[in-house]
């Protein structure tokens, strides 16, 4: 009996699996019109793991909120003991503590299709949704007085913009205010596309301004760190405070006195 050559069959099967994999990847976060897999890997929260992620101090400095294994936890920095605060079928990340210590807002990723905002009542231990659609919401952060939340969303057109929305008692009050809007660079940038993005808002202590990262009119990287008023179309009054070929994880954080900010840098790499 002559041996049968399986090489073409193996090649066909391998190519079939590759095709299925690429098709599945193409379906990730369909609401996003920019970024692609590069953004998914370096900007969105990581896949579930045992590694703590996105730490945030409680206002009294007694606890640290972290994302870990798809849930939000609070960690005692003295003992290292962690207590799970949230759990459901979504992947939770990016916790941010309200200034009064009563709430934690966070993101909920549903099977790499959409990312929503949810909020935890620390007194009752119950969470409820703040957004429920097919868009992407990231980087939620309370204003210094707790009356507003800044966040990033792909609503309504699929590009990443910064919004501010009033909140009270764990519920929205009023409509979102667009700090930035869609803007075209004019040509397709490697990894980043032609549509500008505006991400990772951080409040200044007076609650009147934000630092954001944006590649608005920037040819390389995820952009510069901009200082913008926290008002509608504040991006039109933006001032560049750091010009660097940044990456998604720059994530500026402003000091309590408002005189400095820390960030992740590509300088020297």
Regions found by a protein language model. Name each.
Residues 79-83, 124-128, 170-177, 232-238:
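Beta-strand initiation motifs
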Residues 25-28, 47-49, 67-73, 87-92, ...:
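A flexible loop/linker signature enriched in serine peptidases of the S9 family
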Residues 56-62, 95-103, 140-148, 201-209, ...:
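Blade-terminus and WD-like Trp-Asp/Gly-His loop motifs, strongest in beta-propeller folds
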Residues 58-63, 67, 74-86, 99, ...:
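Periplasm-facing N-terminal accessory domains of Gram-negative outer-membrane beta-barrel systems
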Residues 39-73:
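Beta-strand-rich domains and repeat architectures in extracellular enzymes and scaffolds
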Residues 8-19:
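Bacterial N-terminal signal peptides
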Residues 1-6:
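Positively charged n-region of N-terminal signal peptides that target proteins for export
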């Amino acid at each position: 009996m002559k041996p049968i050559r399986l090489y073409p069959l193996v090649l066909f099967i391998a190519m079939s699996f590759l095709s299925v994999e690429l098709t599945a990847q193409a379906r990730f976060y369909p609401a996003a019109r920019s970024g692609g897999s590069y953004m998914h890997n370096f900007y969105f929260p990581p896949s579930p793991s045992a590694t703590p992620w996105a730490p945030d101090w409680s206002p009294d400095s007694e606890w640290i909120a972290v994302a870990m294994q798809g849930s939000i936890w609070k960690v005692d920095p003295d003992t290292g003991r962690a207590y799970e605060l949230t759990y459901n079928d979504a992947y939770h990340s990016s916790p941010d503590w309200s200034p009064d210590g009563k709430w934690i807002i966070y993101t909920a990723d549903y099977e790499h299709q959409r990312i929503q905002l949810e909020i935890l009542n620390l007194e009752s231990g119950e969470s409820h949704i703040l957004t429920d659609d097919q868009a992407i919401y990231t980087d939620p952060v309370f204003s210094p007085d707790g009356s507003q939340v800044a966040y990033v969303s792909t609503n309504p057109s699929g590009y990443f913009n910064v919004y501010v929305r009033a909140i009270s008692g764990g519920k929205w009050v009023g409509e979102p205010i667009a700090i930035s809007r869609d803007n075209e660079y004019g040509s397709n940038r490697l990894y980043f596309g032609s549509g500008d993005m505006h991400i990772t808002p951080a409040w200044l202590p007076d609650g009147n301004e934000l630092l954001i990262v944006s590649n608005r009119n920037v040819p390389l990287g995820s952009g510069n760190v901009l200082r913008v008023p926290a008002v509608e179309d504040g991006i039109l009054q933006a001032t560049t405070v750091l010009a660097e070929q940044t990456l998604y994880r720059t994530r500026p954080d402003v000091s309590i006195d408002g005189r400095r900010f820390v960030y992740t840098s590509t300088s020297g790499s």
